Amino acid sequence: MKQAIHPEYKKVTATCSCGATFEFGSTAREDFYVDVCSQCHPFYTGKQKQATTGGRVERFNKRFGAAIKRN
């Protein structure tokens, strides 16, 4: 195997806007910041707000449902 052709593998720290830090190995870059992580993302915390806007079928029935029922 050739020597000294592989990139340097170093520890990198990702810091979230909520203050959580994660350390892992990488060859790509140095420390960086992220907007959301598993500790503050609404999907993972269970505080997810769901906007029930209805699907395509409900939208169709809202527009044409009365016309179909008359026939």
UniProtKB/Swiss-Prot annotation:
Entry binding sites for Zn(2+): C16, C18, C37, C40
The alphabetized UniProt keywords are:
Metal-binding, Ribonucleoprotein, Ribosomal protein, RNA-binding, rRNA-binding, Zinc
- Gene Ontology CC entries for this record: ribonucleoprotein complex; ribosome
The record's listing under InterPro entries reads: Ribosomal_bL28/bL31-like_sf, Ribosomal_bL31, Ribosomal_bL31_A, Ribosomal_bL31_sf
GO terms assigned for molecular function:
metal ion binding; rRNA binding; structural constituent of ribosome
Q: Which cofactor does it need?
A: Zn(2+)
Q: How is the cofactor bound?
A: Binds 1 zinc ion per subunit.
Q: Specify one Pfam family.
A: Ribosomal_L31
PROSITE patterns referenced in this protein's UniProt entry, alphabetically: RIBOSOMAL_L31
Biological processes, Gene Ontology terms: translation
Instruction: Tell me, in a sentence or two, what this protein's role is.
Output: Binds the 23S rRNA.
HAMAP family associated with the record: Ribosomal_bL31_1
List, alphabetically, the PANTHER family matched: 50S RIBOSOMAL PROTEIN L31, CHLOROPLASTIC (PTHR33280), LARGE RIBOSOMAL SUBUNIT PROTEIN BL31A (PTHR33280:SF6)
Describe its partners and assembly state. Answer: Part of the 50S ribosomal subunit.
Q: Which family does it belong to?
A: Belongs to the bacterial ribosomal protein bL31 family. Type A subfamily.
The name this protein carries in UniProt is Large ribosomal subunit protein bL31
Q: Which organism is it from?
A: Chromohalobacter salexigens (strain ATCC BAA-138 / DSM 3043 / CIP 106854 / NCIMB 13768 / 1H11)
State the taxonomy lineage. Answer: Bacteria, Pseudomonadati, Pseudomonadota, Gammaproteobacteria, Oceanospirillales
